[in-house]
Amino acid sequence: MKRVTGTAFMCAAAVTVSLSMADIAKAECGDVTIAEMNWASASLMANVDKIILQEGYGCNAELIPGDTMPTFTSMNEKGAPDVAPELWVNAFKEPLQKAIGEGRLVSANAGPITGLGEGWWVPSKFLEDNPELNTVEKILERPDLFPYSENKSKGAFMTCPSGWACQLANANLYRAFEMEKKGWVLVDPGSSAGLDGSISKAVDRGENWFGYYWSPTAVIGKYGLKMIPFEASFAGNDNWNNCIALPEQDCANPKATSWNESEVNSVITADFKKSGSVAAEFIANRVYPGKVMNEMLVFMVDNQA
């Protein structure tokens, strides 16, 4: 915690957010509880919010351990914590909209980090060497550029470890784009460390890599991965929620589609907006450029911060 807090002090002082610090005026806002989620970017944001709310607005801010669904449920049912700085809302859009409509929660900031999201990525060097292969569909025609270590005649697509929800989506997209017919193998990295290791190994050796990842993360910042757009448009929530995101046996006919757009909000309770209106305005206006966030996450990893 001390290491993260130290980094947060640096971030609060140095990272450019959309709100000018010169405009901050102290205001009594009372007690504020902030969800500190169990991944790096959300933890950093929570610590920065705590520092700014305390030092800039005179709040008595406290960090509360959290995770996506438990935090949303607690805020919705108990009105606490007051702030969830980085809440990935795709999995519970309807309950969130219901809570907002019924006056319990407020989506204070619909874009606290720019350039984030899940999808399929390649190293930047691959695009420099192959500028014409700038969409997923074009890359899928060239499995020979990503040889699978156990069968060089096949291309390797690195998916998520078993047990992750994204593994289901990747497996169904693999079928939807007929990747097996095109000469691809879906490779399970075995673990989060295995996934990260496959990227670092490929980049360090100057080899090509193609697979799933997400941003903001230290891995994206450190290894310079680029998300590849799909030519296929998003085929709708029904296809995604009722097929792509489900186990294969529940998705008989997956349609080719781009990745579901990730939605991340800073969510606050309605009571916090009323009682700490000036501080709530800060939450609504602070934005982290994705490149800056990734660089901060790399700094945290490299310095064990």
What is the predicted role of each segment?
Residues 104-159:
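A conserved helix-loop-strand patch within extracytoplasmic ligand-binding domains
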Residues 41-59:
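Short, polar/charged alpha-helical segment
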Residues 117-128, 263-275, 298-299:
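A bilobed periplasmic-binding-protein/Venus flytrap-type ligand-binding module shared by bacterial periplasmic
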Residues 222-287:
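C-terminal lobe and pocket-closing loops
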Residues 68-125:
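N-terminal segment of the mature folded domain
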Residues 15-24:
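C-terminal segment of classical bacterial N-terminal signal peptides
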Residues 73-74, 81-89, 158-239:
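Ligand-binding pocket segment of bilobal, Venus flytrap-like solute-binding proteins
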Residues 28-41, 59-64, 154-158, 283:
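Short, well-ordered beta-strand elements
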